[in-house]
UniProtKB/Swiss-Prot annotation:
Transmembrane segments: 37-57, 216-236, 242-262, 288-308, 337-357, 381-401, 537-557, 566-586
Main localization of the protein described in the UniProt heading: membrane
Protein name: Choline transporter-like protein 3
Glycosylation sites: N141, N154, N506, N524, N559
GO CC entries: membrane
Keywords attached to this entry: Glycoprotein, Membrane, Transmembrane, Transmembrane helix
Coiled-coil segments on the chain, per record: none
Length: 656
């Protein structure tokens, strides 16, 4: 009898009889699925392209990257003149540092720093007590510390030198990558300079400047993460019992080491804290949060490892079967490479647009010919739309990878003639994806996106609350909401993978595929749940190992450059990159396991093991399933060793 199924506000007509009679074999003739969602994604990306274009035109990322003076010139670049500002439009190619004429007495006035800022070729590393010393420094180093309109020969002769030159004595300073500023080195001047420059800077600028200040370290850690993920991928390809024990040992050591280092760094910060700097307090609070989270994760993982330690041998056999299935289309192992390349390209583009959004503003000439940049309020608040674009597009790219892997493995699994494997299964799967099922990938990625966004909003709201406002009730509410959304996200992730696999087999839309897959797995859940958990847990430990070593490298690298850096944000960026890259690489095995189990359930549903309807499954896979279920039955109910299907027919080896 036909019925209706509701999915994301739309009703789909589902025939029960048609569902029962579905052949569950890879379809040759297909139709486009979830086309409205593909149109929606296209319209969303039209908005993203508009933001990209407008931010590039209106923004000036160079001001953030290289720093700028008080007259509208970006240091280290050749500038265009600003109308009404006579000292603008100068060639600052050789003048790469920002120097404040009164660095020891900075004030914030109307979103701008009061003292005049100049572009100089080098910072004075020794204290200059007189104008003669300032003039000598200019003649020797070619670095002019007075306003551009005053010639260096007139430093000691002009009556206006007191207002056009820095206040004496000029403190020694050194260049620092944060905004390319000359940072005073005397303790008194440094604390005053830092408290104004950092604490009163725009929050978005502080985050972006922290990322740019540590860009080389971030890039190096990303390369390290990429190499470690690749090594872990090939380690799982040639898995063994010894290797599993090594991975588990490294994970335990890594968790304990990272946890200990985080608590040690937090203790170090609490005993060596500059109360003038809010960024130091932010770093300390982030360090405490990192330490608590790592401790909880360490305890939970150690408990799980201890509980599942006796299933290691079966897990190795299961991964051997998975490797055998992957070997039928070995290029699946290289699938994460192009996925990772596309993700990196998109993230670089996203960060470039974010930099432009953060610096979008119009030049306004003030009294005395100085130039101030007034932010464009409308464009600057578009970063929320930009953030949604980051999450949705990243999830879409990963969804395309999962559907490609599903299509290739399905074609290899449902192949009777083992001597004649499918030709180019990956290319065929890609062709089917881009011609018919992009809308399904968009819909699945949208589900994950709308689940992630509330988590981001909750974290932002909670982080804005001051400590007195964080009552026990609000903390408990936040943790429950965060935990609930995390569980929902994990459920949707597995639902999406099953839906993609069903779509790859039957060519149906997302909701129909999800329903069919859920129904057929539910009938065989007793056979599959425990086995699937073991394999996924070991793969998860591989991801944890990559993330642990990446975070440890980040802790060691960023801790050596604390001064004036919001380095908790770059560390979070490295951790996020490590999670995504490790997941992108090792998800090939995780995806392959999920696909194998769904295909196994389909096999049980549509075949009975007889000579007329033999199973497609590999005998090794059948053996692992039977041994695992026998172990479970012996521990719980002592049931018989044979693994029955729904009708009670004993599974038979595949007929060759």
């Amino acid at each position: 009898m036909p019925g209706t199924m509701q999915c994301l506000g739309a009703e789909y007509l589902v025939s029960a009889e048609k569902t029962r009679q579905r052949e569950w074999r890879p379809q040759i003739y297909r139709k486009c699925t979830d086309t409205p969602w593909l149109v929606l994604f296209f319209l969303f990306w039209t908005g993203l392209v508009f933001i990209m274009g407008y931010s590039v035109v209106a923004g000036a990322a160079g001001r953030l990257l290289f720093g700028y003076d008080s007259f509208g010139n970006v240091c280290g670049k050749k500038n265009s003149p600003v109308e009404g500002a006579p000292l603008s439009g100068q060639d600052m190619t050789l003048k790469k540092h920002v120097f404040f004429m009164n660095a020891c007495n900075l004030e914030v006035k109307d979103r701008g720093l009061g003292p005049t800022a100049l572009c100089v070729s080098s910072c004075p590393e020794k204290q200059l007590d007189t104008l003669e010393e300032v003039q000598l420094f200019a003649n020797i180093n070619g670095s002019f510390l007075c306003v551009y309109s005053l010639n260096s020969f007139n430093y000691t002769q002009s009556s206006s030198a007191d207002t056009l030159c820095p206040r004496l004595p000029v403190p020694p300073s050194k260049p620092f990558p944060l905004f390319n500023r000359c940072i005073p080195q005397t303790p008194e001047c440094y604390s005053l300079f830092a408290s104004v420059l950092i604490n009163d800077a725009d929050a978005l600028h502080r985050i972006l400047s922290g990322i740019m200040a540590g860009r080389d370290t971030i890039l190096g850690l990303c390369v390290f993460t990429f190499a470690l993920s690749l090594a872990m991928l090939f380690a799982f390809r040639f898995i063994s019992t010894l290797l599993i024990h090594i991975i588990i040992s490294l994970v335990i050591l890594g968790l304990l080491f990272v946890c200990g280092v985080l608590w040690w760094l937090y203790y170090d910060y609490t005993n060596d804290l500059s109360t003038e700097l809010d960024t130091e307090k932010e770093n300390m609070n982030c360090m405490l949060a990192f330490a608590i989270i790592s401790t909880v994760v360490t305890v939970l993982l150690l408990a799980l490892i201890f509980t599942l330690r006796k299933r290691i041998k079966l897990t190795v056999e299961l991964l051997h079967v998975t490797n055998k299935a992957i070997s039928s289309c070995p290029f699946l192992l290289f699938q994460p490479l192009w996925t990772c390349a596309i993700l990196i390209f998109f993230w670089v583009l996203w960060v470039a647009v974010l930099l432009s959004l953060g610096t979008a503003g119009t030049a306004q000439v003030m009294e005395g010919g100085q130039v101030e940049y007034k932010p464009l309020s409308g464009i600057r608040y578009m970063w929320w739309y930009h953030l949604i674009g980051l999450i949705w597009t990243s999830e879409f790219i990963l969804a395309c990878q999962r559907m490609t892997v599903a299509g290739a493995m399905v074609a290899c699994y449902f192949n009777r003639n083992q001597n004649d494997p499918p030709a180019r299964p990956i290319l065929s799967s890609l062709f089917v994806l881009f011609c018919y099922h992009q809308g399904t990938a968009v819909k699945g990625s949208f589900l994950l996106t709308v689940t992630r966004i509330p988590r981001v909003i909750f974290m932002c709201i909670y982080s804005t609350l001051k400590e007195p406002q964080r009552s026990a009730w609000s903390r408990g509410e936040f943790r429950c909401s965060h935990c609930g959304l995390w569980c929902l996200l994990k459920y949707l992730y597995h639902l999406n993978q099953d839906a993609y696999t069903a779509t790859a087999i039957n060519g149906t839309d997302f909701c129909t595929s999800a329903k069919d897959a859920h129904t057929i797995i539910a009938k065989n859940s007793s056979h599959l749940t425990s086995v699937n958990c073991f394999g996924n847990f070991v793969i998860f430990l591989g991801k944890v190992l990559v993330v642990c070593f990446s975070i440890f490298g980040g802790l060691m690298a960023f801790n050596y450059s604390r001064a004036l850096q919001v380095w908790a944000i770059p560390l979070l960026l490295v951790a996020f990159f490590a999670c995504v890259v490790a997941h992108s690489f090792l998800s090939v095995f995780e995806t392959a396991l999920d696909i194998l189990f769904l295909c196994f359930a389909v096999d049980l549903e549509t075949n009975d093991g007889s000579s007329e309807k033999p199973y497609f499954m590999d005998p090794g896979f059948l053996s692992v399933i039977k041994r695992t279920n026998n172990l479970n039955n012996a521990k719980s109910q002592g049931q018989k060793d044979a693994l029955p299907n729904e009708e009670g027919t004993e599974l038979q080896p595949i007929v060759r």
